[in-house]
From Swiss-Prot:
Gene Ontology terms: cellular component: endoplasmic reticulum membrane; intracellular membrane-bounded organelle
Source organism phylogeny: Eukaryota, Viridiplantae, Streptophyta, Embryophyta, Tracheophyta
Protein name (record): 3-hydroxy-3-methylglutaryl-coenzyme A reductase 2
Transmembrane segments: 32-56, 77-100
Recorded name of the encoding gene: HMG2
Region of interest called Linker, as start-end residue ranges on this chain: 101-146
Length: 562
């Protein structure tokens, strides 16, 4: 039997061995083709892209004309045949080439019998190739470095402050090092800003970047709030004296009068991108297309793919020249929903772009939403949860608990909250201090404090009801959620749990966030009732002088500077 070995180069005195069998050239995939490679490649590539373009164009025309896709003519049949043929060629050619290249090295063998006896093989040792080894995962590159050295590296800019969590793998250690670096760079002390007692892993990548500690805000409990027959103890995070006490007095007056009642009018988060067209006529055409009821089902299916909770409710548009502002409104389950609605809007924009290629998307938000800004569109159309809350306060409760009269409250509300706000040109500010209560509950329950701007839009109405008093608050823009954002932090989650609305409601998605909005409105109702009573009775200044003043010196002389 012939001894077969891998062929090695054989030389004698630096010259080629002439009588060694010469290997045939390596086979290529193109050897099987009757035509030159560049011709066949050019032909089939051109055929492939031409047929794809033709078929996609025809498919789009059929969708526009509501023609069934399975109805084809002769040109489409030819295009399909060309597409299949070119696809098989490209796939088969690449496959053959891959097989040939992977097997070419293993196929090059020589027969030692072809070499004359007076010649010897070059049997120099060939070292085997070691397989690539994957290094085991190493510990953090800075684990063995002292904190003092890392602080110096951060100060001189060698290590970016924002990368400490990634490089160290320890969020608390990163916060401590960053804190020390900030103190040395600024020359100011952070004494008083606590570092210990907080889970920094819980905010990584979702709540706060480059932390150096956390701010302590006291949380008070007001209540019980009797709302729709259920009692709630309401957490309020605030540094304003009298706020919790005043709201608590309002809760007492409402409870003694039979409680408050709420109505959820609407639940729809909004997002309004801005898109541009070559002309105003073209922009108007797309506006009519988006607002056409016959197109809503298709657009809603595309929008709702973004989430199992997102449900498109309406699309309203406004136009400014050749710029179009479509305002999408959708329900978002128990999430506040800004990310959810933005993803759905992006899906619709991609689809509309395919229908109207001349559309230019300027921005996913065009401020017609309108987020974190006082705006007429929010005040009129609403954003988030639209809640109305009311209570009937007995005349004797007004006198004994609130220390005023029905007539005084009615007159004050008209002249202050209605006429006074109108004279000031207020937008959504026809109330005494709804933002106080909204902010306090928002911070305690992990909501976005910046959305207090529109969430505090409120119309407070106080009217006589016989001898008694009817008070109501209408709040069209309460933007809250019980999942996502700051709601997952331990302190905020505990406050949500106290209210019975922690997390999502699997049985009835969205009901937890809706209930939280009702509680916010009920708390605002109590706060409005108590403050208006204090003003009517002339107690506001006296109470604030007693409970909302601080004599503690926080000037530079009392601080310890580093």
């Amino acid at each position: 039997m012939e001894d077969l070995r891998r062929r090695f180069p054989t030389k004698k005195n630096g010259e080629e061995i002439s009588n060694v069998a010469v290997d045939p050239p390596l086979r290529k995939a193109s050897d099987a083709l009757p035509l030159p490679l560049y011709l066949t490649n050019t032909f089939f590539l051109s055929l492939f892209f031409a047929t794809v373009y033709f078929l996609l164009s025809r498919w789009r025309e059929k969708i526009r004309n509501s023609t069934p896709l399975h109805v084809v003519d002769l040109s489409e049949i030819c295009a399909l045949i060309g597409f299949v043929a070119s696809f098989i060629y490209l796939l088969g050619f690449c496959g053959i080439d891959l097989i040939f290249r992977s097997s070419s090295d293993d196929d090059v063998w020589v027969n030692d019998g072809m070499i004359p006896c007076n010649q010897s093989l070059d049997c120099r040792e060939v070292l085997p190739i070691k397989p690539n080894s994957v290094d085991p995962p190493r510990e953090s590159e800075l684990d063995s470095v002292e904190d003092e050295e890392i602080v110096k590296l951060v100060i001189d800019g060698t290590i970016p402050s924002y990368s400490l969590e990634t490089k160290l793998g320890d969020c608390k250690r990163a916060a401590a090092i960053r804190r020390e670096a900030v103190q040395r760079i600024t020359g100011k002390s952070l004494t008083g800003l606590p570092l210990e007692g907080f889970d920094y892993n819980s905010i990584l990548g979702q709540c706060c970047e480059m932390p150096v500690g956390y701010v302590q805000i006291p949380v008070g409990i007001a209540g019980p709030l009797l709302l729709d027959g259920v009692e709630y103890s309401v957490p309020m995070a605030t540094t304003e004296g009298c706020l919790v006490a005043s709201t608590n007095r309002g809760f007492k007056a409402i409870h003694l009068s039979g409680g408050a009642f709420s109505v959820l009018v609407k639940d729809a988060m909004t997002r309004a991108p801005v898109v541009r067209f070559p002309s105003a006529r073209r922009a108007a055409l797309v506006m009519f297309y988006l607002q056409d009821p016959s197109n809503f089902e298709r657009l809603s299916l595309i929008f709702n793919k973004s989430s199992r909770f997102a449900r498109l409710q309406s699309i309203t548009c406004t136009i400014a020249g050749r710029n179009l502002y479509p305002r999408f409104a959708c329900s978002t389950g128990d999430a506040m929903g800004m990310n959810m609605v933005s993803k759905g809007v992006q899906n619709v924009l991609d689809f509309v772009k395919s229908e109207f290629p001349d559309m230019d998307v300027i921005g996913i938000s065009g401020n017609y939403c309108s987020d974190k800004k006082a705006s007429a569109v929010n005040w009129i159309e609403g954003r988030g949860k639209h809640v109305v809350c009311e209570a009937f306060i007995k005349a004797e409760i007004v006198e004994k608990v609130l220390k005023t009269s029905v007539e005084a409250l009615v007159e004050l509300n008209t002249l202050k909250n209605l006429v006074g706000s109108a004279m000031a040109g207020s937008l959504g500010g026809f109330n005494a201090h709804s933002s106080n209560i909204v902010s306090a509950v928002f911070i305690a329950t992990g909501q976005d404090p910046a959305q207090n701007v529109e969430s505090s839009h409120c119309m407070t109405m106080i009217l006589p009801d016989g001898d008694d008093l009817h008070i109501s608050v209408s709040m069209p823009c309460i933007e809250v959620g019980t999942v996502g954002g700051g709601t997952q932090l331990a302190s905020q989650a505990a406050c949500l749990n106290l209210l019975g609305v922690k997390g999502s409601n699997n049985e009835k998605p969205g009901s937890n966030a809706q209930q939280l909005a009702r509680i916010v409105a009920g708390s605002v109702l109590a706060g409005e009732l108590s403050l208006m009573s204090a003003i009517a009775a002339g107690q506001l200044v006296k109470s604030h002088m007693k409970y909302n003043r601080s004599s503690r010196d926080i000037g530079p002389s009392s601080q310890v500077n580093r």
